[in-house]
Amino acid sequence: AELLIYTQSMMEVGMQEAFSYCNSLKLCGSVSSIEVLKIQQDADVLVHVESFSKQSVFETKMSFSTKLVDYMMAGKIIFAIGPMEVNSLETLRNHNLAITACCDDEVKKQVLAIKNGEVDTKSLTASIHKYITTYRDKIIIQKEMFNRLSELMK
């Protein structure tokens, strides 16, 4: 198994050195949006990581990463790592949309579950389909907004 990491962010030297000791990690840098779609389609598991820093948690606590919707649309297993008080992780866990971990022990446990085929992919796929059609469908969202605005104007 190999973890390919695509990122535009500059990695600290210490992190680069730590990664260099692990043969199953490969830093790939950034890619075009067209390449991203191909990479997502070819992947077995898509990994989403939220920062544990207090500042990042404060900044992202109520947001939901659009990258996660892209991951859901790719139809692949999502493995999300980060603090559970961040909306993205909370939503993924509460709606059974991804495998989640919020500490090192959980990361190890979940990686082993993925590796050993112990993940209920049918349940995840069904949950993703339900979530996308219920909460991310453009027509449904527009209809709800129209109804709310109509009520306000009465």
Annotated model-derived regions:
Residues S65, P83, H95-D105, I114-V119:
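Conserved acidic donor-binding segment of nucleotide-sugar-dependent glycosyltransferases
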Residues F19-C22, M73, R93-N94:
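Short, well-ordered coil/turn elements that cap or connect secondary structure elements
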Residues I39-D42, Q110-I114, R148:
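CheY-like receiver
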Residues I34-I39, L46-M72, I78-E90:
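Nucleotide-sugar-dependent
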Residues C102-K108, E118-S150:
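A charged, aromatic-enriched C-terminal amphipathic alpha-helix characteristic of glycosyltransferases
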Residues L4, C28, V45-V47, F79, ...:
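Hydrophobic/aromatic beta-strand patches that form the interior of the parallel beta-sheet core
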Residues E2-T7, E12-D42, Q55:
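Nucleotide-activated donor-binding/catalytic signature segment of Leloir-type glycosyltransferases, i.e.
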